């Protein structure tokens, strides 16, 4: 009945579905071909899943209130359900640190995403190289990006595949267009910062987080569509509602991340931190 709690429950349900969808989707890539390179997909699933898993447990603690701090044994001794939220917090929080901390995972994904572009455009932006080397690299890069970059500005009016379940065609179109917007923003950042981009860890993190959100949306559409196709969706209407709600939440996050790429306080925060440390 209370809107504040209801919104938390809806978000928790949607994100729980998305976490499982990402795991299933990533695993299916290996099932299709054992030689598939899923480093980026697996890293995104780990990064996004552990972050959202912690958010879910944190919201659970907020909902449970003081009872969340009690052990299951203490709750049961008082005649209440033994929900071990305090244990969930201990077990879940460490996941954002072990097997690749959140910060390391973001840098790894960013490096993998940038590597193909840096191989092409890196020499052009590297002022330490001889002029003739940079000019030759510029000609090669121009030929590559003359076709690639303009396509990023073409809006897509279709979902891109007839395999996308009909209820999710609109969400699929948004994912395609946001993916191209992400590629444009990342390319612009490369041109602006050049080789120094790898030092902009927080900026790169925003690109990675946006990509992870889009991957989560894609996984949700794929898994939900498969469940509907096989008749294993159970309450299909609720499944569609859950997926659409998740995509709305995720799209809002992507929009905010794109805004922060252009408007942020990163430089001021970095300078302040240096002064605090030196003091």
Tell me what each language-model feature is.
Residues 1-279:
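Flavin-dependent oxidoreductase catalytic core characteristic
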